[in-house]
């Protein structure tokens, strides 16, 4: 009897130990789909949109056509009288557009446990914003700020319609201070899944960036759910990080030195990730962003759980004299 009991116990322990292995072999867990962002489309300038097969007019015809078009345009403009109502309509249109963009955004709440000087444990909450960038078939992937969530024990996200879900850190990058969070699709009801909108990554390789209208979403003013409208004022700025130089868009949007979020163009595409790195002491109250084209591959790798590998090279600007002496 004793031997039977011993053999029974051994069989039980063996079964409990091997059961997960056998289950995985018989019913392998479905792997998430690889996240691959579409290739960027080259920016097309207006002159490139002309039909190639159209007959080429003579120089005289072209000049007369341009003069006629200019006169017609000027006549139309002369007949338009703008007043404060038009100004209000413009801002109403921008606000309505921003409400559409807000459907891509989520509020991220990070809860961490800390101890005070009496060794009493208390919880601390931090809030930030993220943007839904992909769906790998099993998870919704959210790009957000790393600083807020890096030490959090619990992470919750609130979608635009109020639905809340637990999130996990999928991958982070120290250099750009970005984190990709994952939310299991099993935690979202089927009827609510249709309400979750996924943003599209655009391009920051503009032929002429300055003057491009943009909308800042997230918390660009340092206030949860704030927004800003404006344009790209300059793109000739470079932010040097380890193994990379990133294009910086300087905007004319007043914000906060701690502001975070994303820049959208008027086609609903992300063109930049707002950064707290400042290219000049005088720019601390102006929103700037890293161009999305430089971050596209990094975000794709993080969305697939891949680590960012760095050689450790940091570039600096040198004078012409120093360069010639090298």
State what each model feature region is.
Residues 186-200, 227-288:
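Active-site region of chymotrypsin-like
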Residues 270-326:
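C-terminal cap/linker of serine protease catalytic domains
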Residues 117-123, 172-176, 187-192, 235-250, ...:
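Gly/Ser-enriched beta-turn/beta-hairpin loop segments
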Residues 14, 103-108, 130, 140, ...:
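Terminal peptide-recognition signature
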Residues 151-169, 174, 209-213, 225-238, ...:
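Beta-strand/loop subdomains of soluble extracytoplasmic proteins
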Residues 200-224:
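Short glycine/Trp-rich loop-beta-loop segment that forms part of the substrate-binding cleft
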Residues 21, 25-28, 135-177, 183-186:
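Catalytic-histidine neighborhood of serine endopeptidases
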Residues 3, 7, 17-135, 142, ...:
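N-terminal activation segment of mature serine protease catalytic domains
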């Amino acid at each position: 009897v004793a031997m039977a009991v011993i053999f029974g116990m051994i069989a039980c322990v063996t079964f409990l130990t091997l059961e997960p292995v056998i289950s995985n072999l018989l019913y392998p867990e479905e792997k998430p789909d690889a996240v691959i962002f579409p290739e960027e489309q080259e920016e097309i300038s207006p002159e490139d949109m002309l039909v190639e097969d159209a007959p080429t007019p003579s120089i005289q015809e072209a000049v007369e056509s341009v003069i006629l078009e200019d006169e017609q345009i000027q006549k139309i403009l002369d007949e338009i009288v703008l007043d404060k109502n038009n100004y209000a309509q413009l801002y109403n249109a921008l606000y309505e557009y921003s409400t559409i963009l807000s459907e891509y955004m989520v509020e991220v709440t990070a809860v961490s446990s800390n101890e005070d000087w009496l060794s009493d444990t208390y919880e601390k909450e931090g809030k930030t914003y993220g943007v839904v960038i992909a769906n790998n078939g099993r998870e919704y992937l959210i790009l957000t700020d790393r600083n807020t969530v890096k030490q959090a024990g619990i992470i919750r996200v609130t979608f635009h319609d109020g639905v809340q879900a637990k999130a996990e850190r999928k991958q982070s990058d120290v250099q750009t201070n970005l984190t990709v969070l994952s939310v299991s699709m099993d935690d979202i009801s089927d009827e609510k899944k249709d309400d979750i909108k996924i943003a599209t990554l655009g391009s920051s390789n503009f032929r002429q960036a300055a003057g491009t209208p943009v909308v800042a979403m997230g918390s660009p003013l340092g206030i949860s759910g704030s927004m800003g409208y404006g344009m790209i004022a300059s793109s000739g700025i470079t932010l040097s990080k380890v193994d990379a130089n990133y294009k910086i868009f300087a905007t004319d949007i007043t914000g906060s030195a701690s502001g975070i979020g994303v820049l959208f163009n008027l086609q609903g595409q992300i063109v930049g990730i707002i950064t707290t790195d400042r290219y000049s002491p005088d720019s601390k109250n102006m929103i700037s962003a890293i161009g999305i084209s430089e971050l596209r591959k990094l975000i794709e790798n993080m969305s697939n759980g891949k680590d960012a590998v760095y050689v450790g090279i940091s570039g600096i600007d040198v004078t012409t004299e120093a360069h010639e002496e090298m």
